[in-house]
Regions:
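An exposed, glycine/acidic-rich loop-and-rim segment of catalytic or binding clefts
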Residues: 37, 43-410
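Secretory targeting and sorting signals
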Residues: 2-36
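Basic polycationic patches enriched in arginine
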Residues: 10-15, 42-43, 314
């Protein structure tokens, strides 16, 4: 395609089965954490070592119990649900030392069980982002998935990993409060082939560093694309829109989409477009431009192809060895800065276009358009149908291995 950029192929995320998932430590504390709120006015500086606690958090309609875990380290506190692996709250200090929640979410389980939940804080699988017409062919066999986003399948379809109860184990150590989440997805689940065993580890280190490590194995060829769908507002949950946040993306290209938000197959240069975030740019600066891609997404809802080093040198390396910076988000008002590093070749920037004032958040206010944004590290949308995109295939004897680090400073 004229003007098209080369694709940053990435295969280092798959390792042989000899590098199997690490076993976790079994220790679950039972102290009940504080309730989920927005900014609480606490001042940072006290700190402390890593701690975890767990409490009941209701049950799904079929009676499956849900837990809420609280992970704390230093001035940072994170609450995680076993339902969907949801990051419900993440409390960190701002530039003045005031501690506040910087992610969007619901105060109770009912919000996450609702069909209106826009994947707040959820783990996404089996396949993050969209697959065209819910259909792909693997090794000569065509697989049909249920569709849930117009004609397409989004985030694994109805009943995806964001709607499952994961098994949680405390795997904390002296350096981090850590939680391991495990989910087994049977052959044919969501229409995907192969029994997939997925392990996701949240590791909270001081000061305000969260590592998300994904691993998965399969007993039959399949496709996998896992991500985390946290909505960020560095000024504080419920504080208004994020249009003054300044975003930098380490990407010279992005994947344009059609009217149903399926990539055309091209990786187009960002130069001269509203998609050029190679220098820090306020999110609201160009979001109202009459660009056809902006119109398709009603704002930003696109995948950027990250500028990566030569991947050939990374074959067989551990996931964390291949980490590279992907994005930097800064809020001038609070002084908070979020830096994202990842082993993935792409990142989806979604500017909260479909928040419509009908959802009540953890702080008691409603979320309107642009009140939060998602930065989802990933392989590319619709890769199973796009032979020129980095492969998302996973086969028996391989391990899906991906790491993303979120670090907040102020």
């Amino acid at each position: 395609v004229p003007g098209q950029l080369p694709l940053p192929f990435r295969t280092a995320r798959r390792r042989t089965l000899a590098a199997v998932l690490g076993a976790g430590l079994l220790a679950a504390a039972l102290a009940a954490p504080a309730g989920a709120t927005g900014g609480d006015g606490r001042r940072g500086g006290g700190g402390g070592g890593p701690t975890t606690s767990v409490e009941p958090f209701g049950a799904t309609p079929d009676g499956t119990a849900v837990e809420r875990w609280t992970l704390s380290h230093g001035d940072t506190t994170m609450r995680v649900l076993t339902y969907g692996g949801v990051i419900q709250t993440l409390e960190v200090p701002d530039g003045a030392g005031e501690v506040g929640n910087v992610v969007l979410g619901f105060a109770d389980l009912a919000g996450y069980l609702s069909e209106d939940d826009p994947y707040f804080g959820s783990l996404i699988g089996r396949y993050g982002n969209r697959i065209a017409e819910g259909r792909f062919t693997l090794d000569g066999t065509t697989h049909q998935l249920p569709v849930n986003d117009g004609p397409n399948t989004l985030h694994g379809g109805p009943g995806g990993f964001s709607e499952r109860v994961w098994t949680a184990t405390d795997v904390s150590d002296d350096e981090a409060a850590a939680l391991q989440l495990v989910l087994v997805s049977a052959d044919g689940d969501q229409g995907f082939p192969g029994t997939l065993t997925t392990t996701v580890t949240y590791r909270l280190e001081a000061p305000s560093r969260l590592t998300v490590h994904y691993q998965a194995t399969t007993d039959a060829p399949t496709v996998v694309n896992l991500t985390q769908h946290t909505y960020w507002n560095l000024a504080g949950e419920g504080s208004g829109d994020v249009y003054d946040h300044e975003l930098r993306l380490d990407a010279s290209g992005y994947t344009p989409v059609d009217e149903t938000l399926i990539p055309t197959g091209e990786v187009a240069p960002v130069d001269g477009t509203p998609f050029d975030f190679r220098e820090p740019t306020p999110i609201g600066e160009r979001i109202r431009q009459a660009d056809q891609q902006i119109l398709f997404g009603q704002g930003y809802d696109h995948n950027w192809a990250l500028d990566r080093a030569d991947d050939g040198a990374r074959e067989g390396s551990d996931s964390e060895d291949a980490l590279e910076q992907a994005a930097v988000l800064h809020d001038p008002a609070s002084g908070r800065t979020l830096t994202i590093s990842t082993t993935e070749p792409g990142i989806q920037f979604y500017s909260g276009n479909f928040l419509d004032g009908t959802l009540v958040g953890t702080g008691g206010g409603v979320y309107r358009q642009g009140d939060g944004l998602a930065l989802e590290t990933q392989h590319f949308p619709d890769s199973p149908n796009q032979p020129d995109f980095p492969s998302t295939e996973l086969r028996p004897g391989e391990v899906y291995d991906s790491t993303t680090v979120f670090e907040i400073t102020s």
